[in-house]
């Protein structure tokens, strides 16, 4: 059984089409870590990205909260008052980590005539350094910090107010914010578990009992 997801504001319109896509091949063969598998797909469910990561704990939310899911291609936001999710306050923007990667590549070429592989830039965003020339890393840090500031600008456009809200950040962009933006740990909670969303999909499928016992 497959439990997968789509960006928050795309789920309503694209769920059925994506579900059909996931089920187009019921018998699948593949290799993973030098082991061969043959599986039979018995069903599929599609859930909102980002929300899946907080689904197991949302019933413990109190006060005003905002979820920010920063993936590779999109940034999704969702508001919740106590444990009640407000579906009217759900937004998706094409402002994921890849936009930051492209901005860094452009800055390095423009300012230093240097090219850097995308994987090294992703590692820099994740760890804060990749051990290259100091001036290059300085330019990368400035660009990443500017991207992080723009993320919070977009959050404010969607109603984020750090004076009254807690912010929950999930997705790969969480490490970026942690490394390149001053985070108040009592107001901004970053979930750095890269499997959090996948675990959330499994949790929601189990809660809704849609798997029929399939694992």
Place the predicted regions along the sequence by residue.
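Nucleotide/phosphate-binding catalytic cleft detector across ATP-hydrolyzing
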Residues: 1-65, 84-99, 119-215
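Short, basic interhelical loop/turn and adjoining N-cap
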Residues: 112-116
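Active-site-proximal alpha-helical scaffolds that flank and shape metal-associated catalytic sites
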Residues: 68-72
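Short beta-strand scaffold segments in enzyme catalytic cores
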Residues: 75-79
């Amino acid at each position: 059984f497959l439990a997968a997801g789509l960006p928050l504001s795309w789920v309503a319109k694209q769920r059925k089409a994506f579900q059909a896509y996931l089920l187009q091949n019921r018998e699948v063969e593949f290799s993973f870590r030098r082991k061969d598998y043959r599986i039979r797909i018995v069903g599929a469910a599609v859930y909102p990205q980002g929300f899946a990561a907080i689904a197991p704990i949302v019933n413990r939310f109190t006060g005003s909260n905002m979820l920010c899911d920063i993936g590779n291609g999109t940034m999704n936001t969702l508001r919740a008052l106590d444990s009640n999710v407000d579906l009217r306050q759900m937004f998706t923007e094409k402002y994921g980590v890849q936009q930051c990667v492209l901005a860094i590549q452009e800055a390095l070429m423009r300012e230093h005539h240097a090219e850097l592989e995308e994987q090294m830039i992703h590692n820099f965003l994740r760890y804060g350094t990749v051990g290259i020339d100091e001036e290059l890393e300085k330019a990368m840090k400035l660009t990443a910090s500017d991207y992080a500031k723009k993320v919070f600008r977009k959050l404010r456009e969607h109603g984020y107010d750090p004076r009254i809200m807690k912010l929950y950040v999930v997705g790969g962009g969480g490490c970026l914010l942690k490394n390149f933006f001053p985070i108040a740990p009592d107001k901004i909670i970053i979930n750095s578990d890269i499997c959090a969303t996948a675990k959330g999909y499994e949790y929601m499928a189990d809660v809704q009992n849609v798997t029929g016992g399939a694992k």
